[in-house]
């Protein structure tokens, strides 16, 4: 018998949407120009360049930029040292990761780009 994960999935996506919203608020509250958030946000996906060397190095570079450790450390250090660029960088990562997870894109497994910790994405 299959397990209905519906309610849990809704909660997980709501959590990620909250991370996305937090990143947007941090960006704006710390003087980040709203028109630059999306171009800055896209820079995070440069981490996919590792896939040119194969699925294992690709998953390593992608996951290094798509987990919450870096933005939380940047946010903490930026707040503690009053270093605005660190807070803005954290905001970029938080918005990117929050949106990716809200849409169902997870950390990559070393087997294939479409294999994530949230399940397989795309067709096939």
Where on the chain are the PLM-derived regions?
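N-terminal membrane-targeting hydrophobic helices
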Residues: 1-124
């Amino acid at each position: 018998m299959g397990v209905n994960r519906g309610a849990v999935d809704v909660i997980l996506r709501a959590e990620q949407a909250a991370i996305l919203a937090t990143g947007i608020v941090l960006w704006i509250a710390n003087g980040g120009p709203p028109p630059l958030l999306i171009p800055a946000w896209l820079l995070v996906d440069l981490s996919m360049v590792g896939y040119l060397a194969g699925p294992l190095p690709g998953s390593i570079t992608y996951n290094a930029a798509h987990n919450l450790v870096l933005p939380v450390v940047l946010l903490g250090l930026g707040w503690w040292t009053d270093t605005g660029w660190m807070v803005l960088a954290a905001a970029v990562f938080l918005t990117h990761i929050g949106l990716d997870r809200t849409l169902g894109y997870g950390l990559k497994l070393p087997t294939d780009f479409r294999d994530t910790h949230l399940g397989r994405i795309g067709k096939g």
